[in-house]
């Protein structure tokens, strides 16, 4: 690398400068405090783990997302985490081994081999919660409620959450009795919402009239809560698992309407992100101007099986940097106290007192001429009579 290029960072790798870093860190603290107020215990998983445990239950996508490195001590392959959720599952199943409910929360960097979208970071900061040990719908409702309060605490503007259930698709495909290859084609068409291609595929692959009607309708069952009633009528003769999944979505909608009457909810029965990972309710949060979700979550039972302890689980993870940037790029207002002479008799005790009370106190160094604004100071410490007092900078 040429000397002139040594300041360059790899594509998608970003640094965070003081003003934004302060805002992001303040948001991180606020959200972790919120999680803990709901009973979630804060954990700090490692940045790297052996690849086998890091990718447990995550599927091929996670494998492709993960940087691999060789451990110089054991010779084994390690991975730099691309998701903290599997780590939390390992900690619940093996490290903690708590009986009953276990609520965990976290905040930390993850790293992707490729960005998730145009101009997206490969080193986002992920914050989230995981609730282990409860298979009932109450757990899913708690996690979705906490996501809504997370976004509210972050001060996000107009946004909505998208809610689905992989149980609908899974039960219909099983009932259809098609091959794995046929399912893969339908799955891709469904995710692309390619109605014409779906119609052609159904005509060529599905002979049962009722099943054809169901598979053709699935991509159109997206919108407000009215689509749940439509789906219930349409799938009246479908496998019981389909009706059970729709019942769960109706219950979630009812509770969220009561708790958060102004929240915007969008239901999509063909939304299958993380299909091979999630096992029930899935959801995401979207904000105007961003193509990708700023938070994703859902139920992912049985992930702990590989660690010898299968546990029901649900949770969500959010992109802290994206949330921070959506809320605005305001610069920090000066709020510090500038000390021009930190060697004055008796001044150090006053400086310590101010810092202990939470004030930002910046002491000038010999020959320092930087303006006050570069130190984020709007006040200064001066001596009046026998006392040191804080005065505004004019």
From Swiss-Prot:
Record's function text: Required for the first step of histidine biosynthesis. May allow the feedback regulation of ATP phosphoribosyltransferase activity by histidine.
Q: What is this protein called?
A: ATP phosphoribosyltransferase regulatory subunit
Which BP terms does GO give this entry? histidyl-tRNA aminoacylation; L-histidine biosynthetic process
Indicate the quaternary assembly.
Answer: Heteromultimer composed of HisG and HisZ subunits.
Tell me the lineage of the source organism: Bacteria, Pseudomonadati, Pseudomonadota, Gammaproteobacteria, Cellvibrionales
The biological pathway it contributes to is: Amino-acid biosynthesis; L-histidine biosynthesis; L-histidine from 5-phospho-alpha-D-ribose 1-diphosphate: step 1/9
HAMAP family xref list? HisZ
Read off the PANTHER family from this record.
HISTIDINE--TRNA LIGASE, MITOCHONDRIAL-RELATED (PTHR43707:SF1), HISTIDYL-TRNA SYNTHETASE (PTHR43707)
- UniProt superkingdom: Bacteria
Tell me the protein family, please: Belongs to the class-II aminoacyl-tRNA synthetase family. HisZ subfamily.
Q: Which terms in the Gene Ontology molecular function aspect does this entry carry?
A: histidine-tRNA ligase activity
**Keywords on this record?**
Amino-acid biosynthesis, Cytoplasm, Histidine biosynthesis
């Amino acid at each position: 690398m040429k000397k002139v290029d040594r300041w360059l960072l790899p594509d998608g790798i970003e640094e965070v400068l003081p003003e934004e870093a302060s805002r992001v860190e303040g948001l991180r603290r606020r959200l972790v405090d919120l999680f803990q107020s709901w009973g979630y215990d804060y954990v700090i998983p490692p940045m790297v783990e052996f690849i086998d445990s890091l990718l447990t239950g995550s599927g091929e996508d996670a494998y492709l997302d993960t940087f691999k490195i060789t451990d110089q001590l054991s010779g084994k392959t390690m991975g730099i985490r691309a998701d903290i959720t599997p780590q939390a599952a390992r900690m619940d199943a093996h490290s903690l081994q708590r009986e009953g409910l276990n609520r965990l929360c976290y905040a930390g960097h993850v790293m992707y081999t490729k960005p998730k979208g145009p101009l997206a970071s490969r080193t986002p900061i992920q914050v989230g919660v995981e609730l282990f040990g409860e298979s009932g719908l109450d757990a899913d409702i708690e996690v979705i409620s906490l996501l809504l309060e997370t976004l509210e605490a972050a001060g996000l503007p107009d946004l909505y959450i998208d809610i689905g259930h992989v149980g609908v698709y899974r039960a219909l495909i099983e009932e259809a009795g098609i091959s794995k290859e046929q399912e893969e084609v339908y799955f891709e068409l469904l995710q692309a919402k390619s109605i014409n291609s779906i119609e052609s595929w159904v005509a060529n692959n599905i002979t049962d009239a009722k099943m054809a009607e169901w598979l053709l309708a699935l991509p159109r069952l997206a919108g407000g809560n009215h689509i749940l009633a439509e789906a219930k009528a349409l799938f009246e003769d479908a496998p019981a698992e389909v009706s059970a999944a729709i019942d769960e979505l109706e219950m979630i909608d009812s509770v969220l309407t009561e708790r958060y009457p102004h929240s915007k909810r969008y239901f999509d029965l063909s939304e299958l992100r993380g299909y091979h990972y999630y096992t029930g309710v899935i959801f995401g949060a979207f904000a105007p101007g961003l193509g990708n979700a700023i938070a994703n979550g859902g139920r992912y039972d049985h992930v702990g099986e590989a660690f010898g302890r299968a546990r029901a689980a649900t949770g969500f993870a959010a992109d802290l940097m994206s949330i921070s940037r959506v809320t605005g790029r305001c610069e920090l207002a000066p709020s510090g106290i500038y000390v021009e002479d930190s060697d004055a008799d008796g001044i150090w005790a006053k400086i310590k007192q101010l810092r202990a009370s939470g004030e930002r106190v910046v002491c000038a160094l010999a020959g320092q001429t930087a303006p006050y604004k570069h130190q984020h100071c709007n006040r200064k410490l001066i001596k009046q009579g026998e006392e040191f007092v804080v005065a505004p900078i004019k």
